[in-house]
Amino acid sequence: MVFHLKPFDVDNIHEHIFDRYTLLESLADGLSQDLGIHQRDEIVQVDIEPPITTKVKGKRKASKGLQPYNFTIRQSIAGLNSSSNANSTTGYVLWSTTPTFARWLLYDGNALPLREEDTDTSIPAIFSGSKSTAVVELGSGISGILPIVLGDQVDHYVCTDQKGILSKLKYNIEENLLQFNRRRCISEFLQIEPPSNEDQQRRNTRLEIMELDWEKFNGPTAQTHLTRISEECSTVHIVAMDVIYNDFLIDPFLKTLNHLRNYYLNEGLITHCIVGIHLRAQDVVEAFLERAILEYNLPICSVEDPFLEKTRVSLYYI
């Protein structure tokens, strides 16, 4: 059994919100009641690992063939709490939506259509198989988890965020580059060139970091890492985790998402978007869905999955 997509229209948004928050309330005793910060330490250890599935002579055993990723992340609690920063400060720490999404995508059997080509669904795989795929991440934050975990599976990965975030994002990616275990990372931003002796057993991933301000973005207008994807890939997924947490962010985010989506569609790429939202304020989630449909005419669906419904994370697929 795999996840399924439940399409939205203006008539079923309220029902979805009501059902999702009612379920959350019934699970309240087993769920953290905080706002979703992964940890409040300056140095955070994060393990993205396959589930423990069997017991052998009394010992638990992990599933075979699934690579673990073990991160050491430096975050900035002072940056999160700063009142002098003119930009958003939430990107200075890791939020729990990102590791939750990464574990589900990599290891959950229900997420198989997003990992492998030629499953019995019409959903294109994120991971590169016979086709060249790319991921553009909006609001990457400082952790570098998805650029490495997903970057290890695709041909192009572009992380984007506000200027003040990028140096810390770069630091964490560089500190965890050894977690690239399937592919070889090349990058202009990180100054990593392809080796002269090409290793034919490992494909390259081009991993780039760039500033992208949602308030100013009107679509790719010059030769950038975003336009390079349209020249070299056939499929692109635009990914954003826990970037919708107040009403002010909804329109700039949807405008940026819509510009990127339309650009890649017009360039002939198979284009989809995955937005992860940590369920906090009910009215913010409802406003996001309503504006996505009514103002931007986006074909948005809820990702219905038994693992996700037991968390505070809702995934939306466009």
UniProtKB/Swiss-Prot annotation:
EC number: 2.1.1.-
Residues reported to bind S-adenosyl-L-methionine: W95, G139, S140, G141, D161, W214, M241
Keyword Ribosomal protein in annotation: no
GO cellular component, one term: protein-containing complex
Keywords noted in UniProt: Methyltransferase, S-adenosyl-L-methionine, Transferase
Source taxon at top rank: Eukaryota
Biological processes annotated in GO: methylation
GO MF, any single term: S-adenosylmethionine-dependent methyltransferase activity
Broadest EC class assigned to this enzyme: transferase
Task of the protein: S-adenosyl-L-methionine-dependent protein-lysine N-methyltransferase that methylates 60S ribosomal protein L1.
This protein's name: Ribosomal lysine N-methyltransferase 5
Name of the gene encoding the protein in the UniProt record: RKM5
